[in-house]
């Protein structure tokens, strides 16, 4: 894609959500990495990618200046004027609105202002200059929620809505002059002026009337409407709309007949939020499949669950096929995962009782997320249509010789409700699966030899690392499951029962963005845990690489006079097999206790060998077994502690890279790019006087979360997908 042609100036790092770009060099780098072709708004070709770039990443879209576009806009305006000159009665232009459409007026301009007045009813923070009386209660109280973020829409939603509304109006079906559209683009998009819009008040029936009334009021320079602007220090501040217009030398709009109605009557806010949600959901779906592949590696699973026969031949649902292909590709080259092509037939007599297949959270991952991928794709198609549609009423056909006026209900935003509720259900399914994968990962009864709570240190009795995350995951997953409930089943009759059915699309879209926040947190915790688990696997592998030499040397030292070298190698293989199994089974205990049990079990191999000798070997071999156990425990513990120190002294060294498949890029992104280290150094040192100097676990998880929410991680994921 071509570089962005126009980029907005940086704006304030505010506590409010949804601002465009933070001022730090890091944040500017992240924003500039989101590239899109120049967005040209013509009413027919707006893409979700362009909407997101314009809403969140400072891209400045331009209006299509072509003669054809200008002509259809001008023709619709002239058709409307001609009908009014003939004295025709036209809804919303010389009649009342909605259930009051039986009223009539000849003052068409005043009617447009009455519409704005009627709809500007949302609850916002009270500015200090507002003319109010003295408070009757205590003058100060701490708020229960953040007043700004709980009452004011994020700027990204508003910018997106302005882009969508311009796309609709540029189609020439609404009777709104080019001059109005041009000023909208210049004031709001080019000069980065964002109206302050209430979060609540829309039922998305006759479109998002109330939110759009604040946009229209700002364009008209209403003193009671506020806007976010960038001051001389680069900070985002609120000023009145008339002041915002003065700052940028833009004359406020005086609305002609139907123009205020044309700005208000549409699904722009619902479509904006749906578009932003769709983009995030697509990326989170890819991330969920990536963390699933990493979980397969961390749990020593198999790519056989994603074999083409299962998905492409036996049950060819498109989402399932897509997911299995992606996960299988991510596991390519992994030394931790088992591979279908290397699968061995195991005889019943050789089967030692291990799981013959992965558990459901891995084995059925593609069947679980596949339908959600299809739903997200369907939602994307709906949003693509919506942001290139006319959602006004009445509508003017500029190609009809008489400029026929159509009365309909394109503002009923149920298509957006349906889209975001499908997305939300898909997000819930992904979150539930990821949560269960993580509970399996931290549980020593299920994780195939990883230590309890993913503690990387030898003494688990002083390291409960992942336990808090396990609890936090349950909390946020529960919240996500609640958000999965539909909004559309809670419709209330409104506006004198005229709007007896209403889509609630914006409300549902808001819930979907909350669900996106929850799943983003779940994935941030998951990436943190998975990288820790992969480092521990690498630690275990490095220890395991040294054990054959250690065991063979110890057998030679203690039992060389009773067994030749060939027998020593044979016994060593049996001892190592026994040790591997027992170490997996005791991963909830401190290292020394594990090793004592492990060598106790392994000594049965030696007892059996000596008991089968013709002479029994005498008493010396039995005494040597006791010595062998004690020496083995001490020597193995020494190796384990040395390797642990080596790993924790270099917590950013990406110890597991050589073991991973294509997931290596994500693992190294967390360790190197984000600077999130392997955990455990403070536990290894038993918290010796340095506790106050360490970053919290949550602090590091927050770094991963931030990279998801600002899109930096998605850039990495996009590059990874391109390289598969």
From Swiss-Prot:
Contains an active site 4-methylidene-imidazol-5-one (MIO), which is formed autocatalytically by cyclization and dehydration of residues Ala-Ser-Gly. The keyword Cytoplasm applies. GO terms for cellular component: cytoplasm. There is a cross-link at residues 205-207 (5-imidazolinone (Ala-Gly)). One of its GO terms (biological process) is cinnamic acid biosynthetic process. Its EC number is 4.3.1.24. One of its GO terms (molecular function) is ammonia-lyase activity. It is an enzyme of class 4 (lyase). Pathway: Phenylpropanoid metabolism; trans-cinnamate biosynthesis; trans-cinnamate from L-phenylalanine: step 1/1. The keyword Ribonucleoprotein does not apply. The modification 2,3-didehydroalanine (Ser) is found at residue 206. Pfam families: Lyase_aromatic. The active site is at residue 91. Keywords: Cytoplasm, Lyase, Phenylalanine catabolism, Phenylpropanoid metabolism. (E)-cinnamate binds at residues 265, 357, 363, 393, 467, 495, 498. Its main location: cytoplasm. It catalyses: L-phenylalanine = (E)-cinnamate + NH4(+). It is found in: Cytoplasm. SUPFAM superfamilies: L-aspartase-like. Belongs to the PAL/histidase family. Catalyzes the non-oxidative deamination of L-phenylalanine to form trans-cinnamic acid and a free ammonium ion. Facilitates the commitment step in phenylpropanoid pathways that produce secondary metabolites such as lignins, coumarins and flavonoids. Homotetramer. This is Phenylalanine ammonia-lyase. It comes from Mycosarcoma maydis (Corn smut fungus). The gene is PAL1.
